[in-house]
A protein has these predicted regions:
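Conserved CoA-thioester-binding segment of acyl-CoA-metabolizing enzymes
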Residues: 1-54
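Terminal peptide-recognition signature
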Residues: 19, 23, 33, 51, ...
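Short, active-site-adjacent cap segments at secondary-structure transitions
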Residues: 56-60, 106-107
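An acidic, glycine-rich surface segment that forms the CoA-thioester-binding/catalytic face
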Residues: 34, 38-45, 64-102, 149
Length: 257
């Protein structure tokens, strides 16, 4: 079964749901489909989920041309809260998720990668928590999930600099669980997913939940703190100055307020 939609295609085979972000001309920026995610995580016939990107990249985060735009009656808090609720819900589902990561995984795209149970990465991957470059911070679990994988110091480095992490270093640091050449990433992810899908679904889901309970509560509490921090940053003069500087192609002049 294959279902193609503008933001995400979905395919089902051998008990595996394969969700593909489908905006390759923009490195999949802003791509996604909540209904596809809901189906994959709830449908009883789905035993394991793969999330990947069409084209050269996994997902390059929010479309930066739309930053700061939203429904006129929506508060900054509610704007971030919608994304936070979606992330928390995805973390609480019992089905295993594998991220097959090629090319760019930036900002929210990187956070989607981090929320998976396993990450198969490519040697050409470029990972980045880019939010600080826009005067804001990760708001869907980036600081929390990355810390569980690579520790506080390296997470602070990525959060505070916005620098890129290449695929080899991501594997060495523990962001990627498997490292493949770009042409082999999807096949490796499917191999793992088929193996999991062939196991007892009750045992698989319970096993995932047993491991998750060791740290997931702390991560979710941290994600809620990200929500408060981000909605506060949206109100600062420095955030507005950063956006203006990007538009005007100049260095920002921050006032620390």
């Amino acid at each position: 079964m294959t279902d193609e939609r503008p933001g995400m295609t979905r395919r089902f085979e051998d008990g595996v749901a394969i969700l593909s972000f489908n905006r390759p001309e923009k490195h999949n920026a802003g791509a996604g489909d909540p209904e596809a995610w809901e189906w994959a995580l709830r449908a009883p016939e789905v035993r394991c989920v793969i999330v990947r990107g069409e084209g050269k990249s996994f997902h390059s985060g929010r479309d930066t041309t739309l930053l700061g735009t939203r429904e006129s009656d929506e508060s900054d808090y509610e704007f971030v809260r919608r994304a936070v609720i979606s992330r928390i819900n995805s973390l609480l589902y019992a089905k295993p998720v594998i991220a097959a990561v090629k090319g760019y995984a930036i900002g929210g795209g990187f956070e989607m990668c981090l929320s998976a149970d396993f990450r198969v990465g490519s040697t050409d991957a470029k990972l980045c928590l880019a939010e600080v470059k826009y005067g804001i911070l990760p708001d869907t679990g980036g600081t929390q999930m990355l810390t569980t994988l690579i520790g506080p110091a390296r997470t602070k480095y990525m959060t505070l600099t916005g620098d890129y992490l290449d695929g080899k270093t991501a594997y060495e640091w523990g962001v990627f669980d498997f490292l493949e050449e770009p042409e082999n990433v999807d096949a490796k992810a499917l191999e793992i997913a088929r193996t999991i899908a062939a196991r007892s679904p009750a045992a698989v889901e319970m096993g995932k939940q047993l491991v998750d309970q060791m740290y997931l509560g702390q991560v979710i509490n941290g994600v809620r703190q990200e929500l408060l921090a981000q909605s506060s940053l949206f109100q600062t003069e420095d955030y507005k100055e950063q956006r203006a500087a990007l538009r005007e192609k100049r260095e920002p002049v921050f006032k620390r307020r």
